[in-house]
From Swiss-Prot:
Subunit structure: Homodimer.
SUPFAM superfamilies, sorted: Alpha-L RNA-binding motif, Nucleotidylyl transferase
InterPro entries xref list: aa-tRNA-synth_I_CS, aa-tRNA-synth_Ic, Rossmann-like_a/b/a_fold, S4_RNA-bd, S4_RNA-bd_sf, SYY-like_C, Tyr-tRNA-ligase, Tyr-tRNA-ligase_bac-type
UniProt-recorded Gene Ontology molecular function terms: ATP binding; RNA binding; tyrosine-tRNA ligase activity
Predominant location: cytoplasm
Name of this protein: Tyrosine--tRNA ligase 1
Gene3D superfamilies on file: HUPs, RNA-binding S4 domain, Tyrosyl-Transfer RNA Synthetase
Amino acid sequence: MSSNNLIKQLQERGLIAQVTDENALAERLAQGPVSLYCGFDPTADSLHLGHLVPLLCLKRFQLAGHKPVALVGGATGLIGDPSFKATERKLNTEATVKEWVEKIRRQVSPFLDFDCGENSAKTANNYDWFGNMDVLAFLRDIGKHFSVNQMINKEAVKQRLNRDDVGISFTEFSYNLLQSYDFARLNEVHGVELQIGGSDQWGNITSGIDLTRRITQKQVFGMTVPLITKSDGTKFGKTEGGAVWLDPKKTSPYKFYQFWINTADADVYRFLKFFTFMNLEDIDALEEEDKNSGKAPRAQYVLAEQVTGMVHGEEGLAAAKRITESLFSGAAADLTEADFAQLAQDGMPVIELEKGADLQQALVNAGLVPSRGQARTMISSNAVAINGEKQSEPEYLFTDSNRLFDRYTLLRRGKKHDCLICWK
């Protein structure tokens, strides 16, 4: 992605929701490298898929020769952003937020290049400037630039202000001032001229632009990426189990890979534009190929490979593909102990059994059949497999050879109903 016509290229990918003074920004980008930032608040111990588009947008700017700053909100994370939130956020302890700041800083780092000369990336933490700021300095130096009349008219907080049952605390109401000052501070220290963020951050970004201009008398810009929606109207980045996290301990690489494999045909080519660095011509060619192949589309596998490899590395991608192929065939021989640990984490239903259990009881406990009688019928009709091997003996007792790594057994009824036994 070149710096020339960068705005146009981002628009062609559908990556711009709003931008301030588009022509002036395009002109500034054409003049030479720009420092830009995106903020990530530590509201949990991991980023999730909702953070990925703005994070990748930082990378797109860096690849075009610009200088990204990833700001982790050690201070703003203690307050909580009320933007479009129906209720007050729970306040986390300083120790918790500090721990999450470090985790998120480590999570962001692999996406950016911190050693590439003039446009090397930087990280920052807004606790560094808010941590020792006293309340009088905050009110005099920052608060005086804000009109409450304008603040209460921002769409991001209107819904809370209009609800008598919830309302908004002064703590959350003041969040807008903190994020605004981040922009002014980063402009002074790092020469940051552009802030990017999700479309829910538009109000905070424009406030930051106003404050920066008042304090520094410099022109700065803001840009938001769209809120990603699915064609069926359901929320993107969620599964039945909740959010899809970037931390492999919270969402395994296998589960992450499967999330992308299950992308609807109506969404997949759009998501390739949002979440990968494939050329638009290649995405269009893939769409045309899928349309004319008469087979299942290949796009979901391309998307899953590209994003899983980017987030979890080649090793994580290889494990995800290995698990997927093994489960498709029903065989467990190629799975490593770490692969089984991924399945136990979030890959399929799991039960624990004492050694000496029989196959009928395992099927009932796993919810694969309603009764021992039904289990006997299923086993006799050759519809049950242990680690990919059919088992037709109704009174079968598990043996040590069934326990892979002395811990795991893969149980299958029919072609699609799986359960992982973890032996006590």
